[in-house]
From Swiss-Prot:
Biological processes per GO annotation: axon guidance; axonogenesis; cellular response to exogenous dsRNA; dsRNA transport; endocytosis; extracellular matrix disassembly; intracellular signal transduction; plasma membrane raft assembly
Gene: Flot1
Phosphoserine modified-residue sites: 19, 163, 385
Cell compartment(s), UniProt: Cell membrane; Endosome; Membrane, Caveola; Melanosome
SUPFAM superfamilies in the record: Band 7/SPFH domain (SSF117892)
Known partners and oligomeric status: Heterooligomeric complex of flotillin-1 and flotillin-2 and caveolin-1 and caveolin-2. Interacts with ECPAS.
Main location: membrane
Name of the protein this chain belongs to: Flotillin-1
Membrane topology: Peripheral membrane protein
Further comment found in the protein's record: Expression increases at least 10-fold as 3T3-L1 cells differentiate into adipocytes.
InterPro entries referenced in this protein's UniProt entry, alphabetically: Band_7 (IPR001107), Band_7/SPFH_dom_sf (IPR036013), Flotillin_C (IPR031905), Flotillin_fam (IPR027705)
Modified residues (Phosphothreonine): 387
Gene3D superfamilies in the record: Band 7 domain
Length: 428
């Protein structure tokens, strides 16, 4: 069976197979029931109020002393723990405290007997150290260590301490009055000097403050310049890094685009090659065959057109020669006719002229009445006497024709009525 204990306690296991007994301070231990037994001892710190009433000092003056001591069983030291177990195992904390208290009180009384009241009263530290030293060397053999010892109180029933203090008090009061007067004197001197030093110190302080402010402003300006410079450098470096990063990204993007474009070009080239092959198979070969056929047809049509052009040229040439011959024959016939007319005019003179005039007279009448044929509407205005309507138009035309011989005579000097009067009658 396992048993445990805290750091303020120690366990001692004895019995079967436990020789010497096992001591465990703050831990656990295995115990065989019935054949082994376990005991515990406290390691708590004990506070002891050590009182020594009416102890005679070296000069025979009885006084009472009260001290405060802190003691405990030392569990970390195996030898001291073994000694404590031998001395106090099975005892309560109160019993252990009583034993330690009696031991300390005895040593305290012994130290008091070897010292005077003045030594104990004036040098408490020396008294405490002697009690601590003597008691520790004795209690350590019991496994107890003295943690601390302090002198708490000193008093007596004979007013020895009070009487001892009166002379000292009177001397102290005298010294106090003298010291007070000297202090006031020195205080006045020191006060004046202090005021002077204060003014000087204040001036120096203001000067130092001004210098410090100046140095602060200068250093602050320097630091601000450096900080702004570093910040500007950092911003510039950041911008440069951003620009470099953007440039790298752009270069990578361009490289990717170049690769993609190269891949696209390769794909397009493959597609072009495939289409060229397809075009070669589907279009070019049939087109070349068709071109060859069309070239043959064009050459045949060209030859045919050349032959047709040559035939047309020959036909035009022959037609031109025929027309030229016809024109020449017509001209010769007209010339002969004109010659014959000239002979007839020579022979008949005025009769021939009259015949020619009469031959052209219908044309003259046609030209005179031509404007009337192109008129869309004719409006006649009459005063109420004479003919009306179409008879009026006919009369007007006949009136114009009746005046024609006069016009011919004025233009040519030939009188149609006279020539007609002198013309001999034709016989059948």
């Amino acid at each position: 069976m396992f048993f445990t204990c805290g750091p303020n306690e120690a366990m001692v296991v004895s019995g079967f197979c436990r020789s010497p007994p096992v001591m465990v301070a703050g831990g656990r231990v295995f115990v065989l029931p019935c054949i082994q037994q376990i005991q515990r001892i406290s390691l708590n710190t004990l506070t002891l109020n050590v009182k020594s009433e009416k102890v005679y000092t070296r000069h025979g003056v009885p006084i009472s002393v009260t001290g405060i001591a802190q003691v405990k069983i030392q569990g970390q030291n195996k030898e001291m723990l073994a000694a404590a177990c031998q001395m106090f195992l099975g005892k309560t904390e109160a019993e252990i405290a009583h034993i330690a208290l009696e031991t300390l009180e005895g040593h305290q009384r012994a130290i008091m007997a070897h010292m005077t009241v003045e030594e104990i009263y004036k040098d408490r530290q020396k008294f405490s150290e002697q009690v601590f030293k003597v008691a520790s060397s004795d209690l350590v053999n019991m496994g107890i260590s003295v943690v601390s010892y302090t002198l708490k109180d000193i008093h007596d029933d004979q007013d020895y301490l009070h009487s001892l203090g009166k002379a000292r008090t009177a001397q102290v009061q005298k010294d106090a009055r003298i010291g007070e007067a000297e202090a006031k004197r020195d205080a006045g001197i020191r006060e004046a000097k202090a005021k002077q030093e204060k003014v000087s110190a204040q001036c120096l302080s203001e000067i130092e403050m001004a210098k410090a402010q100046r140095d602060y402003e200068l250093k602050k300006a320097t630091y601000d310049i450096e900080v702004n410079t570093r910040r500007a450098q950092a911003d510039l470096a950041y911008q440069l890094q951003v620009a470099k990063t953007k440039q790298q990204i752009e270069e990578q993007r361009v490289q990717v685009q170049v690769v993609e474009r190269a891949q696209q070009v390769a794909v397009q080239e493959q597609e072009i090659a495939r289409r060229e092959k397809e075009l070669e198979a589907r279009v070019r070969k049939p087109a070349e065959a068709e071109r060859y056929r069309l070239e043959r047809l064009a050459e045949a049509e060209k030859a045919q057109l050349i032959m047709q052009a040559e035939a047309e040229a020959e036909s035009v040439r022959m037609r031109g020669e025929a027309e030229a011959f016809a024109i020449g024959a017509r001209a010769r016939a007209e010339a002969e006719q004109m010659a014959k007319k000239a002979e007839a005019f020579q022979m008949y003179q005025e009769a021939a002229q009259l015949d020619m005039l009469l031959e052209k007279l219908p044309q003259v009448a046609e030209e005179i009445s031509g404007p009337l044929t192109s008129a869309n509407k004719i409006t006649l205005v009459s005063s109420g006497s004479g003919t009306m309507g179409a008879a009026k138009v006919t009369g007007e035309v006949l009136d114009i024709l009746s005046r024609l011989p006069e016009s011919v005579e004025r233009l040519t000097g030939v009188s149609i009525s006279q020539v007609n009067h002198n013309k001999p009658l034709r016989t059948a």
